[in-house]
């Protein structure tokens, strides 16, 4: 979300770009500028996101762990994309929550057919898992209105200082504490 609003782009460091070669290739096909450095990549937003078809595969193929984030981008593309999940079953559980935000996604077996929309609307959504939950937060950052993501224990377990890192990029995100439910 912060990246979508910032013309300067963002530096993502601390990794070898070769290890994410297929992800960067697909992002470039979507119109996103990915300038590789020795220890990461400088990513700049696209004027228009282009649709792309993706199949998850073992390394060096497209990693299943990045499928949810790419689905968020694909849901905003100018056209239709297909994501085929070849590694895990039930990996599209977050897609129904993304639809609640205005995405146009149809799931058939291990395929997600995604038709790009102009934008997302804020909504109350539930994180079904680690990767899907993070993708919902990203979608919420670029949505019109407020998005509340519940069941964030998945995200907290898997991403260290997730909220703080997004805030450092300029994102308007906070971890809200909700009271324990009262059982009658």
Show where each model-derived region lies.
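Short, structured segments at the rim of ligand-binding sites
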Residues: 1-184
């Amino acid at each position: 979300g912060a990246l979508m609003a910032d013309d300067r782009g963002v530096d993502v460091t601390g990794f070898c770009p070769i290890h994410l070669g297929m992800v960067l290739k697909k992002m470039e096909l979507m119109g996103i500028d990915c300038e590789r450095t020795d220890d990461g990549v400088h990513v700049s937003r696209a004027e228009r996101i282009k649709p792309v078809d993706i199949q998850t595969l073992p390394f060096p193929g497209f990693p299943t762990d990045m499928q949810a984030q790419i689905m968020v981008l694909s849901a905003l593309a100018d056209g239709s994309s297909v994501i085929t999940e070849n590694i895990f079953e039930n990996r599209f559980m977050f897609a129904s929550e993304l639809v609640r935000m205005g995405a146009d996604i149809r799931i058939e077996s291990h395929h997600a057919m995604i038709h790009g929309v102009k934008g997302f609307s804020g909504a109350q959504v539930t994180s079904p898992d680690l990767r899907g939950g993070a993708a919902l937060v990203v979608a919420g950052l670029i949505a019109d209105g407020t998005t509340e993501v519940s069941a964030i224990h998945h995200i907290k377990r898997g991403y260290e200082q997730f909220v703080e890192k997004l805030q450092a990029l300029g994102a308007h995100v906070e971890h809200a504490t909700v009271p324990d439910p009262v059982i009658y």
